[in-house]
Amino acid sequence: MVTAVLNHHQRAGGLVHRLRKQQAHDWRLKCRPVCASTELELSHWLQSVPWRGEFPRAVLADHQTRGQGQRGRRWEAARGGVWISAALPWNSSSGHADMLGLMVAYALCERLEQAGLPVRIKWPNDLLIDSHKLAGLLPRLVFRGGRLRMVRIGVGMNVANPVPAGAIALRDLLPPGCARREVWTVEVLRALERIQTLANRPELVRREIEKRLWAHQVKDPQSGEIWEIQGLALNGALQLCQGARSASWTRWPDANHDNLYNLA
């Protein structure tokens, strides 16, 4: 049964009702009107109430003042969007988690495509529509005793919030009344539930993600070289070629840091 835990925010009751109506998993939810970061809130929750792995947990915020992004980037998440940090149990029967962020991206694409939206996946963790950023993901794997026990996923999706240049919100894309934060919060949680099913079908996930990749070429920000995108490896690495040369990126190269990719 979905429950709201240690929560005095009226939003929680509506979410619990919607999730129960859809026969969702047994989520434990915390909703905050405002917080520095849902990632930090989730970490504190996992520390104060030790993880036993029975139920997935999620922290949701109306407004984040210091949201966490890739490589420690900080950003402010305004009211009107979906800002979630979730922890889900994972065990040996849950399948492979190598493509965790991409699996979440694909699961979100499925939900958005049902609304008629032409979503593209910008490797590794962003969702784009018409080259504008709609959502970003922050995946993490948590090991205990050398075994994967938990996956953590942060999701930020622009719904009815103001967005900066280069971004887009669902309210700009959907008919009036269809870009409701409560509805899309449930859609995100349902997408997170789907990843364990997808983890047992890695070839399917790879094929479907490759169909939705945002571009055919990428530019290396360090060298300025243009590489052709060939597809994905089963571990989620981006496979590239340039004439007779090939490369595999395991993360996006940074112009100020060493690349984490292999050349051949």
Question: Which residues does each predicted region cover?
Answer:
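Long, positively charged amphipathic alpha-helical accessory segments at protein N-termini or as interdomain linkers
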Residues: 1-12, 24, 91-119, 129-264
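N-terminal lobe of the biotin/lipoate ligase/transferase fold
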Residues: 1-114, 232, 260-264
